[in-house]
Regions:
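Conserved "HGTGT" condensation-loop signature of ketosynthase/thiolase-family condensing enzymes
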Residues: 1-125
Length: 125
């Protein structure tokens, strides 16, 4: 039987792994700046992180925490492993940004932003 073996949660005020709060002291206000603080706390060493949208950053960090806790070998992926992502607002942050690019006064659709309006892009990142 398949089961969830580890999970993480990221909110504006809490980062937890398997229900246990992580000891991260935030110096920034709630919001995207905290994602960078979590990244630095984890010492992830993945430069592409800084080019990601906020949803992908959160997904990357959540995955990094879970996979590390399971001692997952990134060099030899196991096909029986899966990830499940959930949030309450999907890609709303990017949806708003894309809407700005197609507003009547500023009509210039951005494919670079549009790709991040697809919630599953976080899995690819």
């Amino acid at each position: 039987m398949k089961k969830i073996t580890a999970y993480s949660r990221l909110t504006d005020s809490l980062v937890s792994l398997n229900g246990i709060p992580c000891n991260i002291s935030f110096s920034s206000e709630p919001g995207p700046g905290r994602l960078v603080e979590i990244y630095r706390f984890l010492e992830a060493g993945y430069p592409k992180f800084f080019k990601m949208d906020n949803l992908s950053k959160a997904g990357f960090l959540a995955s990094e925490m879970v996979l590390r806790s399971l001692h997952y070998d990134m060099e030899s992926p196991d096909e029986s492993t899966a990830v499940v992502f959930a949030n309450r607002s999907s890609s709303l942050d990017n949806d708003k940004r894309f809407q700005e690019t197609i507003s009547r006064d500023n009509y210039f659709p951005s494919p670079a932003v549009f790709v991040y309006t697809l919630p599953n892009i976080v899995t690819g990142e």
